Each structure stands twice: as C-alpha cells, then as structure tokens.
Amino acid sequence: MSSLTLFIFFLQLFIFTSSVSGISIKRCTEEENNTWEIEVGLCIQTENFRAIKTGCYKIQGPGGLLTEGNGFKIFAHDDCSKEETQNNFILDSVNKAVYALGKYVYMEISTSNITTLYSLPQCAKRISLSISCDQVTTEMKSYVESVSFKDYDLEFVITTDISCVKHVSSSVIVRNECEKKYISTGKKIFGFNNKIDCSAVKFSEHVNYLKTCSVGKFDRKKYYEHQHNYIKKIFHHNEL
C-alpha cells in the first residue's frame, strides 16, 4: 500500500470519526441532558406463602409513599423532616407484576422528569425502601443492602423482612433522558448473581407485564406497631 493510499485512508477515517462524533454530540438537547429518571426494581421471592393477585395500591405522603397488596407492604421515604421537605418525595410511580403463581413479585418504584436532581436537599437524596410482610406481626428480621451514586450524591437503602421473604434482587437506575436513549449506563444491580431476572422473566421483559398500582387510602388499622416508624416518616406524623 502506497503512502498516498495510506494518507487517503486515514483522512477518510478521521472525517468519518469526526462526523460520527459530531452527530453524537448533537443528538441530545439541553432539556434531555437535564431531565432525569430514577427507577428501583425489586424482584421479591416469597417464603412459605404465595403472593395472591389482590391488586396493588399506592399511598403517597409528603415524605414518601407506601404500597399495599400481594401479602406485603413496601415503605419508601427519604430522610427529610417536615420542616426540610416541600412535599416532593422524588419517587411517585409504582408498578408490579406477579410471576410463577405468586412465588415471585416484581415491583418497580420510580420517577421521571426530574429537572432538579443536583439541587435537591441532601435529605431528599437518602432514600430508604423497606419490605414488610402482612403475616408478620412482630419486629422484622431484617436484611439490609445499600447502593450509592457518588456522581449525584444519591444513596438507596433496601431493608427486607427475611422471615417471610426468601430472597430479593434489586436494581437501581439513575440516568438522564439522553443516556436513556443512547447509552446503557447508570444502572447498579445487587442481589443474587448480580441479576434482576425474576422467575423466568428477564429484566428487559418486565415492562411487558407491569401493571400500574391504583391509588389507595391510608388506614392506620392495617399497620402493626413495628411499622409505625415508617408511617411517621412518610406522613410526617410525630406519633400514631
């Protein structure tokens, strides 16, 4: 191959690379770069009971949210006090799917269209999710996992009642709209074999089975004493 041929080859390669790079830069708008979503996925394998398809209900409070249905409750809240929050707990959507005749439940708790991720107060970036079973009336036997995203100063803590839950695999995704379109990034998975497959359903297929949880109404009579601390965090009650 002559020197001229090599020169032409590398020139074409440079032009192509520059062109592709330029296209990549222009693909995302400023709005897409500054609009974020957070998604927490929980694959819950039940122990000694089957999660019946009783429906799923979401109850939102100023400091968090809770879900009811399928034999357990999930309490999600941040670390903000009544004085620190503006009634804007960042997770606001709950979807669920029941697999394998109730042996597995996949829960997705998420939010989208966040434009203030970096300016959120520190307390709002500390998010706790606790899985508590309806059939357990005493203090939880807890297993705790945590994951952090240092670039965004976000931390997630997941607590599971292992007296009625055999296993939980979890994923947390934090990404902006640009990353969602073009890059598989911002995802952290922890749990069994670093997978979030649930029963025979792969992670990418959950979207085909998820149903949106209905809006429910809070009834304090449904909650045991060991769950009251979560309720106080979610609704900013000093006592129950």
Swiss-Prot record:
Stored InterPro entries: Apoptosis_reg_M-T4, M-T4_sf, Poxvirus_T4p_C, Poxvirus_T4p_N
Say which domain of life the source belongs to: Viruses
A Pfam family cross-referenced in the UniProt record is: Pox_T4_N
Q: Which parts of the chain are coiled coil?
A: none
- Which family is this sequence assigned to? Belongs to the poxviruses B9 family.
Q: What is this protein called?
A: T4 protein
